[in-house]
């Protein structure tokens, strides 16, 4: 009789590949077969629960159409100042309409980095390429000069003037 504490071996039956393939080609085909984990990922992405019209980011739509290997090669690209400005304008437009989308603060990165009373144009100038606020004394706006007898009557606006082709304010 066999001992009970010996490890049991599980044998799998592997369906034979086409008989006309040589063993090297058969091995390459076997290696290219997806693992169960990638099958779960691809089946989740092709499921009808994901509605492309509900996905706000067009970059994400194109990413869903890619294979897992192509998605793995892609790197995250930080947005340019123009793209950042467009995101902020879009976000402010939605706030004015009263439609605050879920996760909007995380996507633009301006919600938490802007202290009250600072216009959004100054937030953009403070944002670095990583999307985090730079803490420098020169970036803090002065509402009125010390010792000045007249306080500033200009209120901070939420309007962001458009940039000209060189990236400077056209105002």
From Swiss-Prot:
The gene coding this protein: PPP1R1A
Phosphothreonine modified-residue sites: 35
Keyword Protein transport part of the UniProt annotation: no
N-acetylmethionine, modified sites: 1
Name of the protein in question: Protein phosphatase 1 regulatory subunit 1A
Positions of modified residues (Phosphoserine): 43, 46-47, 67
Biased composition annotated in UniProt, kind: Basic and acidic residues: 19-29, 135-157
Quaternary organization: Interacts with PPP1R15A.
Region Essential for activity: start-end pairs: 9-12, 42-54
GO molecular function list: protein serine/threonine phosphatase inhibitor activity
Keyword Transcription regulation annotated: no
One of the protein's GO biological processes: glycogen metabolic process
